[in-house]
């Protein structure tokens, strides 16, 4: 029994160390965003703004879960963008369900949470979906001019995936989704 406790204690300490290292390896804008959330949480607690406090705690919880899942990998503003977008989508789905069940009080709360999350989403130094779509559209137009029988896999090969996130200010998943969307409409 004693060895079991010692083993569990060591594994807990190692996982905490990995989590701390994940934070230090993250980008500066990621760290600034998390610090801003914590500062805003404190302000919401002082102002007794329950809705904002609960929403920010949910965001911080999602970020913490993302850090744990990353297991030491670098996290950046694109990971936050994906997380915030996912949370907004979840709330929109909840609104649909609440409308079906005539729960207007919960609909208003979810809409307010969406506005709070969109505020933090807008603060991230990430390109908007329209900006990404415009760049992808230009890229596909150039590629189709040089090769009229362009396939989707060829379009993916032409993108420098190591440099694209920093050059385009977008995550690879956002760029890939835009390429697929634009390719279908241009074909």
From Swiss-Prot:
Key words, A-Z: Mitochondrion, Transit peptide
Pfam families for the chain: YqeY
GO molecular function terms noted in the UniProt entry: carbon-nitrogen ligase activity, with glutamine as amido-N-donor
Gene3D superfamilies membership: Uncharacterised protein YqeY/AIM41 PF09424, N-terminal domain
Keyword Methyltransferase recorded: no
Family annotation (InterPro entries): Asn/Gln_tRNA_amidoTrase-B-like, YqeY/Aim41, YqeY/Aim41_N
GO cellular component: mitochondrion
PANTHER family linked to this entry: ALTERED INHERITANCE OF MITOCHONDRIA PROTEIN 41, MITOCHONDRIAL
Protein name: Altered inheritance of mitochondria protein 41, mitochondrial
Source organism: Lachancea thermotolerans (strain ATCC 56472 / CBS 6340 / NRRL Y-8284) (Yeast)
């Amino acid at each position: 029994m004693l060895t079991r406790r010692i083993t569990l204690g060591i594994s807990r300490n190692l996982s905490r160390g990995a989590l701390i290292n994940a934070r230090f390896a993250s980008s500066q804008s990621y760290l600034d965003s998390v610090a801003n959330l914590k500062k805003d949480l404190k302000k919401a607690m002082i102002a007794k703004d329950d809705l904002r406090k609960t929403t920010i705690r949910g965001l911080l919880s999602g970020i913490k879960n993302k850090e744990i899942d990353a297991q030491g990998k670098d996290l950046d503003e694109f990971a936050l963008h994906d997380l915030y977008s996912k949370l907004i989508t979840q709330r929109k789905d909840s609104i649909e369900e609440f409308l079906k069940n005539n729960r207007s009080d919960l609909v208003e709360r979810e809409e307010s949470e969406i506005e709070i999350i969109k505020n933090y989403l807008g603060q991230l130094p990430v390109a908007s979906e329209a900006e990404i779509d415009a760049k992808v559209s230009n890229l596909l137009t150039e590629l189709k001019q040089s090769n009229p029988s362009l396939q989707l896999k060829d379009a993916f090969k032409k993108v420098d995936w190591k440099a694209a996130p920093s050059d385009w200010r977008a995550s690879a998943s956002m760029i890939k989704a835009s390429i697929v969307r634009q390719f279908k409409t241009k074909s």
